[in-house]
Amino acid sequence: MFVPRQVKAVANVNIELLDLMYFQNSYNVPYRLKKGGDIEIKPILVKDYPLYEWSMSVLNIKKNEINDIEIIQMSYLDFLVNKLFVQDENELHKLLNIIRLCLGYESVSFDKDKGKICLLLCNKEGIIEKVINSKEFDDIAKIILFQNDFNYDDRYINPDVEAIMQEYSKVKYGDINNPTLEQRKAFVSSKIGKTFSELNEIPYREFDLVYHSALNGEIYIAQKIIQGSYKYDVKEDIKHPLFEKKKDPYSEVFDDPSVLQNKGIQGASQLNTLNFNESQKE
């Protein structure tokens, strides 16, 4: 029987390797702590996704873009505990939700180890079982975000480019309705014959991939029907979305700046002078 090896706390989490070994198979990701042994990072189930979706923002705040040298110099965990949670208790509840759903612990606390903030995972009796330092917290947060979203992307984007991209998405897709999770479950249920109760127990990442696969199949068939109709002149052959080259969401705005220019969006004219690759931090 294949037993995936444990992930050690190293300088950089190898997401590509984790994807091959764990994410694609909906396995828990084992992570070895310096203190407290091992923990398992569990994928989010469909039934828990709404709460996870509300809570996940606490893991990817762009701390280093805040104009405060003290905050920039802090670890992410230190920033959460000593800045964010003091200002907004809801942010603390978000982290507690993430820890319960992904790590399986209901009781947590914070303390210092060698002057640095640590996250303590406790059992029901309040006894400390795991100690997560700031570097390990960063690793675990990164694993959680990639584990539960097939399309998650943590590349650095120049703030000016990102602002233009947000306007681009708002203008181009503003009139498109995003189906609710309930509607997506109904669609998937109609395709694979599983009840809502059965779908609720599927890892969300798996469910989301099935949803988009089924949706793309319908779009492909509809487009092929249009292509075969004498009423429409479709010059290019239509490929199934599964075989199309994956589009870079960050590059799309550079390929089609006219969307923003036609709307008179400020900054659209700058797209020709901005180089996306050079805008990224090494």
Model-based region annotation:
Residues M1-S75, S134-Q227, E282:
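An amphipathic, hydrophobic-aromatic interaction surface with interspersed Lys/Arg
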